[in-house]
Amino acid sequence: MTALSNMKCEACQADAPKVTDEELAELIRMIPDWGVQVRDGVMQLERVYKFKNFKLAMAFTNKLADLAEDEFHHPGIFTEWGKVTVTWWSHSIKGLHKNDFIMAAKTDQLLA
């Protein structure tokens, strides 16, 4: 399979299929630092990134904002001193789509 970070997001409509359990098991192995959370019945990907100070955390947040705009897929972002929590899910389908895994991999690359 092509590296997730090399893929582009596709338009996700309300009738797009959520990832299957089998797809979830395969895709989550490709982004090992991410976890799956369920909030209000909605499955989401989440990772906490740690930084030495607030300025570095904010710089990462701004890079992530640019990436999200470029891909037209937007995460939940919680920025605080030394830490940024990023949550990906597809709002239109209220769950996980392959786009979320692509964006998680691209988010990881922002640290490179």
UniProtKB/Swiss-Prot annotation:
Report which superkingdom the organism of origin falls in. Bacteria
Identify which top EC class this enzyme belongs to.
Answer: lyase
UniProt keywords (A-Z) are:
Lyase
Q: Which SUPFAM superfamilies match?
A: PCD-like
- Gene Ontology terms, MF aspect: 4-alpha-hydroxytetrahydrobiopterin dehydratase activity
Instruction: Name a single GO biological process.
Output: tetrahydrobiopterin biosynthetic process
Q: What is its EC number?
A: 4.2.1.96
Task: Tell me where the signal peptide lies.
Answer: none
Which Gene3D superfamilies does the UniProt entry name for this protein?
A: Transcriptional coactivator/pterin dehydratase
Q: Which reaction does it catalyse?
A: (4aS,6R)-4a-hydroxy-L-erythro-5,6,7,8-tetrahydrobiopterin = (6R)-L-erythro-6,7-dihydrobiopterin + H2O
A Pfam cross-reference name: Pterin_4a
Q: Give the protein family.
A: Belongs to the pterin-4-alpha-carbinolamine dehydratase family.
Q: What is this protein called?
A: Putative pterin-4-alpha-carbinolamine dehydratase
